Amino acid sequence: MYPGKVYRGVKEIRGSLLIVDGIEEAAYDEVVKIYGKDSRERFGRVLETSIGQAVVQVLGDREGLETDTLLKFTGSTFKIRVSEDVIGRVFNGRFEPIDGLPPILSGELREITGEPINPISREYPHDFIQTGVSAIDGLFSMVRGQKLPIFSVSGLPHNLLAAQVARQATVRGEGEQFAVVFAGIGLRKTEAEFFLEQFRETGAIERLVAVLNMADDPAVERLMTPRIALTVAEYLAFDLDMHVLVIMSDMTNYCEALREVSSARGEIPGRLGYPGYMYSDLATIYERAGVIKGKKGSITLFPILTMPGGDLRHPIPDLTGYITEGQIFLSQEMYAQGIYPPINILPSLSRLMKSGIGPGKTREDHRYLADQLYDAYSRGVKARDLARIIGEIGLSERNRRFLKFAEEFENKFVNQGFYENRSIEETLDLGWQVLSILPEEELVRIPQKIIEKYHPKYRS
């Protein structure tokens, strides 16, 4: 009934961990098939090995497992079957269907561990992805193949933003195929229901693959979920020539699971108890995104993480910032003012933006307009800080203009509806409309010929 080498008996059961003695050969991350008294097949992964002993983490249901449990060590790591049929499907964190449809039976078996893209094989990202969110498209443009994270804080609407981007994101150009892979990591039930409702009601599910790991699932499953999502994305991008946007929420839950598993293995902890290899572990995930020379498809990564205590120096955001190509911050202050999405403009950055905008990609005025909006808004924020000290009446006429600009910029440009999908042309035109509050002589970062072509005063 159980082909291959099978071990009967478990020395100890600690929650979802099985301690097995008398093991001759076992490897870290090896898949183990587990059979209880009901003969039902379960799966586990080897967390730790030593001479004659192995620690196995059970994936999924643990009911009915006792000390006389049967374990079969398969000799391979976790694999999933991928094909074009994955599009439109919803899976759990072990890639088992949870949408009432049958499992994927045809296609290729792929190991989920994967490999980062060889730097020599990489092509520099240079094509624009439209999210429909003005603050992102206009000021921190996302480029195909980029790794652009959202740095948030618990209580802010990062899940709303993730759902909106998943619904609205698209690539420009005829004949370009686009798909979204959504990885929910450590989601609460209400969060998972929200995402599924959004994807199904808006029709986004038709071009989307969802891999949902729940908060009550084993920690080791959270370590698998982003890798499963990226394995699916690699197949769609590099085998089917699609442009794939991978959204991961919340990577903080992934890092917490990494710390939990590391502690269970008895490893020496690093900063705040996180393993010393967390940086390289995150890199094995993030560096799977990109564009490969000679391949038509691309993988763009949009991870979302909540900074514990809002601390940017916490190991999770700190290490993430070294790997990714920019970051977008969400602001508690702007959220309290009723602004959605509450994107904190001044500390946010997209390092690859300039390669993905301009003539033939977005519009010739995009770069100049973004620079001017950022500059004017920073002056407006300084004027607001000054007004808090001396009062608005004490400001110069120039500072009052910039203060008014900052308010209009936040309320009209940054602020937009959850179901409002703005094209890049609408975003840029709106930017010019807000800039028209300022005198033309203040637009020092825009060439005169661009002003005369796009400024509302000349266009009207």
Swiss-Prot record:
One of its GO terms (cellular component) is plasma membrane. Keywords: ATP synthesis, Cell membrane, Hydrogen ion transport, Ion transport, Membrane, Transport. The keyword Transport applies. It is a peripheral membrane protein. It is found in: Cell membrane. Component of the A-type ATP synthase that produces ATP from ADP in the presence of a proton gradient across the membrane. The B chain is a regulatory subunit. This is A-type ATP synthase subunit B. The gene is atpB.
